[in-house]
């Protein structure tokens, strides 16, 4: 089997008892399965939920708390306990486990995004096992990942994983909810995620998680767009993860992306970066960036809207005021207004240009379809 870089996402429902407490027997089973993956030569990154489940009983809650403050308090206690269990068990197999806590803000800020990438690459290089969870103690409702489902997809793209395994208590994707429709058909394989499946995914599943199939389907769609194949389903037994990689998993396989990986800079621009302004361009510039893969030059800019600095990200509009792309500018809005519509040689006479391009093609992502059809 070809050596792969694999992201394993374990949801709360797969790590807990019926009462919602952390199930150490289940955790031990996943540890053994991951150890076998590593022995087979694969690189593994673990995205693990379970901090709230591990901590709420220690604080005297009879059941999993439902308030944000309660969840954050339970996570503050539980994250340390969860990592302690993982580190002790992986240590028995000679594996160093490393903890990373992330929030959406870590993805939105380019410096923090790049730092997360560098840290993960160094850990893999050193043979450590990164264990990632959302920083539940500081996250707020608007910035959460949905039981780490979307977090696992974004991390998979960031580190150029070959496969994302989203493990849950349901054995795959169905054409209807199998809990309410006994004759629901399970999909063994899907080449893509149809839009209608996002609408029928349902809400949060068990009372110990925040994901549900809808968030898993959305995460799978994001991972596919980043060039990562996806498995959604169950994994029971120490050889379960190896079975998944060999095509014998108990769940649904999604996608066959091949080599469609997008670099981390373009991923950040497309998925995470805040937009600071708008640059409108003419038909010639639109054709150059859309059809010919070229950079945006000052000559193609017809107007500038908003206030931004060099290094900020802007939307690029065509003459019909449609968003066609998103890119990281090399000039401030003030500088760009001085040189818009000018050829590069003329622009250099007006302001000091570090580069000829307003937006280099390596910092530009086409977004016409995903933005204009929404």
From Swiss-Prot:
Presence of the UniProt keyword Flavoprotein in the record: no
Catalyzed reactions per annotation: L-glutamate + ATP = L-glutamyl 5-phosphate + ADP
One GO MF term attached to the UniProt entry: RNA binding
Protein location: Cytoplasm
Domain PUA: 276-354
Cytoplasm as UniProt keyword: yes
Positions annotated to bind substrate: 49, 136, 148
UniProt pathway annotation: Amino-acid biosynthesis; L-proline biosynthesis; L-glutamate 5-semialdehyde from L-glutamate: step 1/2
NCBIfam families attached to this UniProt entry: proB
Family that this chain belongs to: Belongs to the glutamate 5-kinase family.
Name the UniProt record assigns to this protein: Glutamate 5-kinase
Organism: Halalkalibacterium halodurans (strain ATCC BAA-125 / DSM 18197 / FERM 7344 / JCM 9153 / C-125) (Bacillus halodurans)
């Amino acid at each position: 089997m070809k050596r792969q870089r694999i992201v394993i996402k374990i949801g709360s429902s797969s790590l807990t008892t019926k009462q919602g407490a952390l199930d150490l027997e289940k955790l031990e089973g996943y540890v053994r399965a991951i150890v076998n993956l590593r022995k087979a030569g694969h690189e593994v990154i673990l995205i693990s939920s379970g901090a709230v489940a591990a901590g709420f009983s220690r604080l005297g809650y009879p059941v999993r708390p439902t308030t944000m403050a309660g969840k954050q308090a339970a996570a503050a206690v539980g994250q340390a306990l969860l990592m302690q269990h993982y580190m002790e068990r992986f240590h028995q197999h000679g594996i160093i486990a490393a903890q990373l806590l992330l929030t959406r803000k870590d993805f939105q800020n380019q410096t923090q995004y790049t730092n997360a990438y560098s840290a993960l690459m160094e850990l893999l290089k050193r043979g450590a096992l990164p264990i990632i969870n959302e920083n539940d103690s500081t996250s707020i409702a608007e910035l959460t990942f949905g039981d780490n489902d979307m977090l696992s997809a974004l991390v998979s793209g960031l580190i150029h994983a070959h496969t994302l395994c989203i493990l849950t208590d349901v054995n795959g994707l169905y054409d209807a909810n199998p809990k309410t429709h006994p004759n629901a058909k399970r999909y063994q394989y899907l080449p893509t995620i149809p839009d209608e499946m996002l609408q029928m995914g349902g809400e949060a599943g068990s009372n110990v998680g925040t994901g549900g199939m809808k968030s898993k389907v959305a995460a799978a769609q994001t991972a596919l767009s980043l060039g990562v194949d996806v498995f959604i389903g169950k994994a029971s037994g120490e050889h379960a993860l190896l079975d998944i990689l060999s095509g014998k998993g108990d769940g649904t396989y999604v996608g066959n992306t091949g080599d469609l990986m997008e670099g981390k800079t373009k991923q950040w621009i497309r998925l995470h970066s805040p937009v600071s302004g708008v640059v409108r361009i003419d038909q010639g510039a639109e054709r150059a960036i859309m059809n010919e893969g070229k950079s945006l030059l000052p000559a193609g800019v017809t107007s500038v809207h908003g206030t931004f600095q060099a290094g900020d990200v802007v939307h690029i509009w065509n003459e019909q005021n449609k968003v066609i792309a998103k890119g990281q500018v090399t000039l401030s809005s003030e500088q760009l207004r001085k040189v818009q519509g000018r050829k590069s040689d003329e622009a250099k006479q007006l302001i000091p240009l570090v580069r000829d391009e307003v937006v280099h093609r390596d910092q530009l992502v086409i977004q016409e379809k995903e933005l204009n059809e929404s």
